[in-house]
């Protein structure tokens, strides 16, 4: 790996700053071999996957939907929850099977989900007969790629030799880590978005744009990544030759535009994706304070059952963490990272109520690098994180794996 550039005076203080400016590698384009740290991270990744599979097995036997059940059901059934059904329906039947669509009263609003993960699922299913196993395999492979990319990004930001391993550890033990092991789109998105960010810091702009475009096929968050990449490009371009890759930055918007065109051709609605979000998940625009108020009432005013109320409490906490992260990034002048996280918060924090913000934290790599810097500086902070995150990650995993709403 390239040697880190000399740090500025501010960075020579005993307390390393939050996300110091990353190094830029204009040299080699060939991927380096796996280091000892990479192998350690992959071992940790395998162990955390095994722990989640054990949890899933135990959940099906200890917490069945029917307390009198004598059969735990199919071994992969705990992973067939919630959004997985939408991805499966799109992959197996398409977006508008047999002429059905949003004009039907019982429509499931599946067009709210971008096509990247369902397309990958359909492709893998050609060689893996089980749809669920195919989805888990995608997330398993993508998650491994993602943690290796995260290790390399952490090395750019932090000088500590253990920075990459620590950052990956914090992500894999995070409260919502279960969603990296299920048939959801988070792992696949990270497997594309993190290498795109890494390529941008190496000024490999065509590669960064292609990877970001692929990430946009998976989640709308790819557009937030594209905005961060564009800002990073503007802030780092110095010479005329640096500006030549500028047209590539339009590429990540193409998948979203093509998807909107496809939906318009089938529904006559250019905003079909947004309207599906509104119908299925109450994502009509509301002022941020209105969304906070509604979420607070849902969490604490006893208007919902305790399980849903707890998850809304988690939504509020995740919003506070996100706002604090953006404030820190702005304070440290990490503008592209602040734009990426800020756009995510704006999209999730301006609907009727908060939904999926805890899950979105998985995609905020600046958060995990920031926490890694703090834990490397303070062993007590690391101990506190592990002790607090462990029960939360267990609760979220059990909640999801037993079929309850987990955000």
Stretches with model-predicted labels:
Residues 172, 179, 193-198, 206-233, ...:
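Membrane-interface alpha helices of multi-pass inner-membrane proteins
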Residues 123, 137-158, 324-325:
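Transmembrane-helix motifs of polytopic, lipid-linked glycan transferases
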Residues 81-97, 104-128, 288-297:
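Short hydrophobic/aromatic helix or loop-helix immediately within or flanking a transmembrane segment
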Residues 182-188, 357:
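Short acidic/glycine- and proline-prone juxtamembrane loop motifs at membrane-interface regions
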Residues 105-106, 111, 115, 119, ...:
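Loop-to-helix entry region of an early transmembrane alpha helix in multi-pass inner-membrane enzymes
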Residues 130-134, 150-173, 335-339:
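Transmembrane-helix signature of polytopic, membrane-embedded enzymes
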Residues 250-253, 377-407:
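Signature aromatic-anchored transmembrane alpha helix within multi-pass, membrane-resident enzymes
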Residues 51-65, 226-322, 336-341:
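Membrane-lumen/periplasm interface segments of specific transmembrane helices
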């Amino acid at each position: 790996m390239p040697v880190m550039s000399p740090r500025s005076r501010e960075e020579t203080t005993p307390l390393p700053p939050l996300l110091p400016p990353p190094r830029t590698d204009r040299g080699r384009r060939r991927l380096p071999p796996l280091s000892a740290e990479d192998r350690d991270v992959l071992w940790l990744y395998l162990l955390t996957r095994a722990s989640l599979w054990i949890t899933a097995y135990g959940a099906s036997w200890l917490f069945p939907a029917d307390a009198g059940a004598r059969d735990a059901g199919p071994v992969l059934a705990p992973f067939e929850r919630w959004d997985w059904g939408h991805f499966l329906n799109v992959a197996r039947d398409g977006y508008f099977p047999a002429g059905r669509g949003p004009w039907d009263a019982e429509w499931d609003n599946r067009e709210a989900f971008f096509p990247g993960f369902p397309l990958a699922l359909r492709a893998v299913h050609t060689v893996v007969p089980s749809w669920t196993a195919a989805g888990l395999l995608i997330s398993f492979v993508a998650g491994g790629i993602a943690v290796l990319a995260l290790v390399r990004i952490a090395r750019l930001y932090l000088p500590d030799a253990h920075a990459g391993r620590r950052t990956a550890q914090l992500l894999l033990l995070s409260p919502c880590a279960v969603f990296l092991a299920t048939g959801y789109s988070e792992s696949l998105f990270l497997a594309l978005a993190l290498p795109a960010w890494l390529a941008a810091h190496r000024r490999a702009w065509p590669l960064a744009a292609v990877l970001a475009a692929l990430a946009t096929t998976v989640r709308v968050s790819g557009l937030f990544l594209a905005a961060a990449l564009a800002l990073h490009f503007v802030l780092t371009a110095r010479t005329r030759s640096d500006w030549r890759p500028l047209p590539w930055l339009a590429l990540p918007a193409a998948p979203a535009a093509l998807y909107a065109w496809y939906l318009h051709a089938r529904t006559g609605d250019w905003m079909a994706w947004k309207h599906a979000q509104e119908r299925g998940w109450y994502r009509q625009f509301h002022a941020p304070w209105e969304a906070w108020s509604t979420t607070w009432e849902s969490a604490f005013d006893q208007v919902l059952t305790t399980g849903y109320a707890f998850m809304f409490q988690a939504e509020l906490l995740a919003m506070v963490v996100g706002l604090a992260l953006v404030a820190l990034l702005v304070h440290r002048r990490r503008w592209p990272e602040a734009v990426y996280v800020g756009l995510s918060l704006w999209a999730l924090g301006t609907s009727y109520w908060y939904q999926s913000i805890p899950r979105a934290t998985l995609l905020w790599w600046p958060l995990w690098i920031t926490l890694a810097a703090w834990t490397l500086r303070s062993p007590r902070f690391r101990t506190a994180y592990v002790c607090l995150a462990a029960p939360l990650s267990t609760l979220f995993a059990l909640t999801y794996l037993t079929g309850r709403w987990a955000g």
